[in-house]
Swiss-Prot record:
UniProt xrefs under Pfam families: MFS_1 (PF07690)
InterPro entries recorded: MFS, MFS_dom, MFS_trans_sf
Organism whose genome encodes this protein: Penicillium oxalicum (strain 114-2 / CGMCC 5302)
Designated name of the protein: MFS-type transporter opdM
Stretches assigned to coiled coil: none
PANTHER family hit by this protein: MAJOR FACILITATOR SUPERFAMILY (PTHR23501), MULTIDRUG TRANSPORTER, PUTATIVE (AFU_ORTHOLOGUE AFUA_8G00940)-RELATED (PTHR23501:SF193)
Matches recorded under SUPFAM superfamilies: MFS general substrate transporter (SSF103473)
Length: 560
């Protein structure tokens, strides 16, 4: 190895010991690929090609996040058509469970196969699932479609960030991630608005059909556009023949998937279909814990070839970025579910109008996501945005916990806006931190870990929020409306209880609903405080340092 290549190896590989282990365990074709990677110069995308790439992956992230929340306002119509009230929980959990089970494995796909074609393959599976949901003629068919769409979504966020890593240098990524996440999270928070509009003025099936024409547009944007990879990749046929069985850790996947499914099923069943102390829920939790223990032992045995490598779990920035992402996504899911409940239950707004009432939050989040991304690219440091966003989130959710049936429009709009600014500032911080800290083969795997943490954060804290909401509501109704029938009100649902409550009891029931929503926002305050703590772990590093090093190397080469 030449003298001028040695510093480059040290800068680009934070785990040289792992590189040595890879060299020992690899076959000749792997060694050739490693040599190519050492000399590989990335091809950054510019101009109209960059616009097409960013537009394509932004639309995909938007659809993925939209699909998580759009079904919430369509569920009443779906259950009426299919007479399937008992399947309500599965319309959301089938998507989440299948996505979480596959997410860690997606890092391996993006490591060894073309990012563009892997991304389009996962997106294609997502589109097939959407089509099945749209044409479903039974509740079971709809659940199967949601599960297929979840499998497709498992590789979409990781793929979007992997493509971005190969398309633009690290200094420009904060701006691009700000745009992608700013627009993408419009789908998560605006899903109830879109779903309410389709359900009210057309049919719930368009909640899924809409993915198809947008998918065709994504195909036009990406299919014929050259998207460079972060590193040279072997031909797919050679990878499938010589790499998949040795490197993809399918045993780890076979252990991780059922462990995840059992945990998420326990969270789904607990307090809904079964009590938390039931044999079913306890059995699922115990089975999940035991399987996760076996999975951890297997991953330790596999070393650097593990689906979730130990050196990444021990990496402080990856670890804290994943935890931060979990807290962000958990509090975002709670916000997207319980603000509409406040507007529809307490303020008697329609599904469509309640979605419109979320606009202060949505627009402020979009503006701050773009502004923070641009300023991070200019100034270099992303940690301040994480701390600043966490503070705004804590303040905003603290104010949201004071909502009542008589809260004025300027007040709740201001509270929403504060949370929107906070979420916009912090959302992209974990992604930037990981892409800035992790290099080479580990980028896709680290991003898969982060997206998996996101999914678990959403599922776990949404379940905790549901427990808090249900228990508080059951306590507060007798307190504020002593003569009301608690079981009848709860069974009627968040929008149907008005038909079963007398005019005398209605103010008390509305106050009970408002207090129950407030109690869930206390959980969001706690998650925001956790964001503040974990944000300090993402590292005080600058995305501009890599560019400065590259410029110094170019000057050395020119002088030589």
């Amino acid at each position: 190895m030449s003298e001028d290549s040695q510093p480059r190896l040290l800068e680009s590989d934070p785990n040289p010991g792992d590189r040595d282990l890879k060299a020992v365990n690899s076959n000749p074709s792997d060694n050739r690929l490693n040599n190519q990677s050492d000399d590989y110069e990335p091809e950054w995308v510019e101009g109209i090609t960059l616009v097409m790439v960013i537009s394509g992956i932004t639309l995909v992230v938007f659809l993925m996040l939209l699909d998580m929340s759009i079904v919430s306002t369509a569920i009443p119509k779906i259950t009426t058509q299919f007479d399937s009230l008992g399947d309500v929980a599965w319309y959301g959990s089938a998507y989440t469970i299948s996505s979480a089970a596959f997410q860690p494995l997606t890092g391996k796909f993006y490591n060894y196969l073309s990012s563009k074609w892997t991304f389009l393959s996962f997106f294609g599976i997502f589109e097939v699932g959407s089509l099945v949901c749209g044409v479903a003629n039974s509740s079971k068919m709809l659940i199967i479609g949601r599960a297929v769409a979840g499998v497709g979504s498992s590789g979409m966020m990781n793929g979007a960030l992997s493509i971005l890593a190969g398309a633009v240098p690290i200094k420009r990524r904060p701006t691009m991630i700000g745009i992608i996440m700013g627009v993408g999270q419009l789908g998560l928070v605006g899903g109830p608005l879109v779903g309410g509009a389709f359900t009210t003025y057309s049919t719930w099936r368009w909640c899924f059909y809409m993915n198809l024409p947008v998918g065709a547009l994504v195909g036009v944007l990406l299919l014929f556009t050259r998207v460079p990879d972060q590193k040279p990749k072997q031909p797919a046929r050679e990878v499938l023949r010589s790499v998949v069985l040795r490197r993809f850790d399918f045993i780890g996947f076979v252990l991780f998937a059922p462990a995840s499914i059992m945990l998420l099923l326990a969270l789904q069943y607990g307090g809904n279909e079964y009590s938390w102390d039931s044999a079913t829920v306890i059995g699922l939790i115990c089975g999940s814990v035991a399987t996760f223990v076996v999975f951890g032992l297997w991953e330790r045995h596999m070393g650097i070839e593990a689906m979730i490598p130990g050196h990444l779990v021990r990496d402080k920035i990856v670890f804290f970025s994943s935890l931060l992402s979990m807290m962000i996504f958990g509090f975002t899911m709670i916000l997207s579910y319980y603000l509409p409940i406040y507007f529809q239950s307490v303020r008697d707004k329609s599904a469509l109008v309640s979605g419109v009432d979320l606009l202060p939050n949505i627009l402020c989040q979009l503006v701050m996501a773009v502004v923070s991304g641009v300023l991070t690219s200019k100034l270099g440091y992303y940690l301040p945005w994480g701390v600043f966003g966490a503070i705004l989130n804590a303040l905003g959710n603290g104010l949201l916990s004071t909502l009542s049936p008589t809260t004025s429009v300027p007040s709740w709009a201001g509270y929403e806006s504060l949370v929107g600014f906070g979420r916009g500032a912090i959302s992209q911080v974990p992604m930037i931190a990981i892409q800035n800290a992790v290099k080479g083969d580990d980028v896709s795997t680290a991003m898969a870990m982060m997206t998996c943490a996101q999914t678990f954060g959403g599922a776990i804290f949404l379940a905790v929020g549901q427990v808090i909401f249900a228990q508080t509501l059951r306590q507060k109704i007798p307190e504020y409306a002593p003569s009301a029938n608690v079981d009848e009100i709860i069974a009627a649902g968040a929008t149907g209880f008005r038909e079963n409550v007398s005019a005398q009891n209605l103010p008390g029931v509305l106050a009970a609903y408002a207090k129950s929503v407030d109690s869930v926002f206390y959980l969001n305050v706690a998650l925001s405080c956790a964001q503040f703590v974990f944000a300090w772990g993402v590292g005080w590093k600058s995305v501009k340092k890599e560019k400065q090093k590259d410029s110094e190397e170019e000057k050395v080469v020119e002088s030589a």
